[in-house]
């Protein structure tokens, strides 16, 4: 049986929950498109997050690996296109580290593109009434750090998805968009399914002008 690694993060930045882990863990043990999903929690820490990710990649040898993170304030589900070789933290991670203008991997390539069918995923989400977009930047915090490290490692079809706040988080952030947990779970389930069943990605617009 094929396997899928789905990772989420612990809460960070003063939050008490993280939608990435709350959604990912709902799919742990589920079979999607003939593949078994294994959800794993990553620390929101530079270095340690990749250490744990690599342990899970070695243990599971997945066919697909999708890392998931929180992007509070985003108005949609963001399917990431690219990860860059830069750690530039606006505030410390959960271990108190705040790297500024440091490489994720010394002497590594400037960037990596996701190998997931990102446009097919976005199209599929929109068809189901879920707000989604192709994102051109995964930021420079631990999410980008993990996405870059995942793609640098190589192996499974891989990429990263950012989820917006959950409603209980948005209450503390007036005006912020939120998405129900059930919708977050449905989005990840579809992303896993399409990553397993779609070959070449769809050729359709998904760019931005800024």
Swiss-Prot record:
GO MF terms here are: pyroglutamyl-peptidase activity
Sorted alphabetically, the Gene Ontology cellular component annotations on this record are: cytosol
Look up keyword Transmembrane and say if it applies.
no
Entry annotated with the keyword Magnesium: no
Q: Which reaction does it catalyse?
A: Release of an N-terminal pyroglutamyl group from a polypeptide, the second amino acid generally not being Pro
Q: Where in the cell is it found?
A: Cytoplasm
List the keywords (alphabetical).
Cytoplasm, Hydrolase, Protease, Thiol protease
Q: Which InterPro entries match?
A: Peptidase_C15, Peptidase_C15-like, Peptidase_C15-like_sf, PGP-I_bact-type, PGPEP1_Cys_AS
Spell out the catalytic residues: 80, 143, 162
List GO BP terms, alphabetically.
proteolysis
Q: Short name of one Pfam family for this protein?
A: Peptidase_C15
> How does it associate, per the subunit comment?
Homotetramer.
Family membership noted in the UniProt record: Belongs to the peptidase C15 family.
What's the name of the protein? Answer: Pyrrolidone-carboxylate peptidase
Q: Which gene encodes it?
A: pcp
